[in-house]
Design a protein with these regions (language model features):
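Conserved short submotifs of the Hanks-type protein kinase catalytic core
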Residues: 88-103, 107
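AlphaC helix of the eukaryotic protein kinase fold
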Residues: 49-71
Length: 291
């Protein structure tokens, strides 16, 4: 029999929140559904695994995620209400809005590739969230379908929310096209299937790396496949750096896509950042004719 989770049924922050159940878990921490009686609402609380509390690299990553997300106000970014350390045991936490629905990966796995007229409006909204983040000097660095959550809001059936800024890099200045955010040279962070060529090579990153990752997401959402055929994470990393993408219509010959959409994706997936759309707003504008 599994031991009971010590957080379930617990009141935290002076009784402000009552933790009801665990709704997700990952390498960094667990996410719980909790009630906030004073506000008459449900919230999601992400708590860093206690066993990781002594890992300075991971605690700093968790704090970085909280700081990055707390700066963002765009409706398509998950909203953070408060973050800090629990008084009782020092556990790091983030209190966020509670979302109902499924992530983009689950949607594609359940329903298959998403039609262009449905997929493009989703990605356009994500571009809006990224544009705000980039203007504040925040690069996500781990965009993937699992980090785009589809909820219902304001009568919109597919209302995406960008999640998990755990790998975000925050600078003190506003991001301009081509400006640099320093990472540890030679270190590779992110998810191999969705990382940009410069990220795969451990180079310095800016907003254009996120644009590449978002274009990979769009490609997979439309086709159910990635832009390259590969058998391992290392092979994906290599192909992002060296191999041209397979055009949409070649990847799924049974479906037809506008030639112009292939051209938009080819530009967004250029190996060289300077040849891509330079901002999320530019990518947004290029996608609009197809949505």
């Amino acid at each position: 029999m599994r031991p009971k989770d010590p957080f379930i049924g617990r009141e935290i922050l002076g009784g402000e929140y009552l933790i009801l159940e665990k709704i997700g878990t990952g390498g960094m921490g667990s996410v719980y559904k909790a009630s906030q009686p004073a506000m008459k609402r449900m919230v999601a609380i992400k708590i860093l695994h206690p066993k990781l509390a002594n890992r300075k690299d991971l605690t700093s990553r968790f704090r970085r995620e909280a700081r990055a997300m707390s700066q963002l106000t765009h409706p398509n970014t998950v909203k953070v209400f408060v973050y800090g350390e629990l008084e009782e045991d020092g556990s790091l936490y983030i209190v966020m809005e509670m979302l109902e629905g499924k992530n983009l990966n689950q949607a594609v796995r359940k329903d298959g590739p998403i039609p262009t007229e449905r997929a493009i409006p989703i990605l356009i909204q994500v571009c809006g969230a990224l544009q705000e983040a980039h203007e504040l000097g925040i690069v996500h660095r781990d965009l993937k379908p699992e980090n785009i959550f589809l909820s219902k809001q304001g009568g919109i059936a597919d209302f995406p929310k960008v999640l998990d800024f755990g790998l975000a890099k925050v600078t003190e200045r506003q991001m301009q096209p081509g400006s640099i955010i320093l990472t540890q040279e030679g270190m590779v962070f992110g998810t191999p299937e969705f990382m940009s060529p410069e990220q795969a090579q451990g180079k310095t990153l800016d907003a254009r790396s996120d644009i590449y990752s978002l274009a990979v997401i769009l490609y997979e959402v439309l086709t159910g496949k990635l832009p390259f055929s590969a058998k391992s994470p290392m092979e994906y990393i290599q192909k992002h750096v060296t191999e041209p993408i397979i055009p949409l219509s070649e990847r799924v010959p049974e479906r037809r896509f506008p030639k112009e959409l292939d051209e938009v994706l080819a530009r967004a997936l250029s190996k060289k950042p300077e040849q891509r759309y330079q901002t999320a707003a530019e990518f947004d504008e290029a996608l609009r004719p197809f949505g």
